[in-house]
């Protein structure tokens, strides 16, 4: 379980410095893993018989296209599927659009997700996105999608109008902002959509798990923007194998309780001890991932649950 896909956040550097960026990426960001280590990781993932999909994101992965292509060429002989996430800045050059799509098609890229909305617009022209979407029609085997982060005051409807016919047939997803990264200080809370509350028990479940090797060197159990501000890491040593990472994901008691009992288990403990405000848990939220971020964003908070988790273990597993 959880061993068929893996994601790598290559670099925090980006051509943009968006107000909503979960990583607070910018042209001056320098946080990244060493290239040789990334090469070793990708080689390990490519050779792993259980991994089917390898995903690359950033920062902006196309800023160092030579390195990105090198990594994809490492993977190609092993016939793994590749997915990419980009803000599409490179679409301004039709020559690059042609080159990159030709390479992606030959290197088994099955999906390209473009992140573009009103927050990206100051840094990337809509014509760049339009060029990418229009050219993608020549490559039906590459699934193109457009992801748009939105707030109440910036729904990006005029962006869709600017893109015109180029969006026909393209999967478009608008998703509400999560207050993490740059958004914590640059996006007003009243502008963030909040569909759920702590009273909605059906919303208090973790939506899923994907192993992510982050550019800060940590290994995280999912790809939600909020997870990168928590202390839930699967890393125990530098040369940790992928098999060991999967083992840690499956055996971690905190994550097991999340999968089995949901966030309600942790929230009930806080309610019983009048700790909801102390843990800064939002009553209303756009995504349960924001609650996760508040629950586990410090070692002290995680340690608070240890006695309860130990009791849970003794009651459910200890012989």
From Swiss-Prot:
Q: Which cofactor does it need?
A: [4Fe-4S] cluster
| Entry-linked Pfam families | Fer4_12, Radical_SAM
Return the cofactor note field: Binds 1 [4Fe-4S] cluster. The cluster is coordinated with 3 cysteines and an exchangeable S-adenosyl-L-methionine.
Among InterPro entries, the record links this protein to: Aldolase_TIM (IPR013785), Pep_rSAM_mat_YydG (IPR023904), Radical_SAM_PqqE_MftC-like (IPR050377), rSAM (IPR007197)
Binding sites annotated in the UniProt record for [4Fe-4S] cluster = 14, 18, 21
Q: Which Gene3D superfamilies match?
A: Aldolase class I
The Radical SAM core domain, residue ranges: 1-214
What keywords would UniProt list here?
Answer: 4Fe-4S, Iron, Iron-sulfur, Metal-binding, S-adenosyl-L-methionine
Give one GO term, molecular function aspect: metal ion binding
* PROSITE patterns in alphabetical order: RADICAL_SAM
Name assigned to this protein: Putative peptide biosynthesis protein YydG
Which species does this protein come from? Answer: Bacillus subtilis (strain 168)
Report which gene this protein is encoded by.
yydG
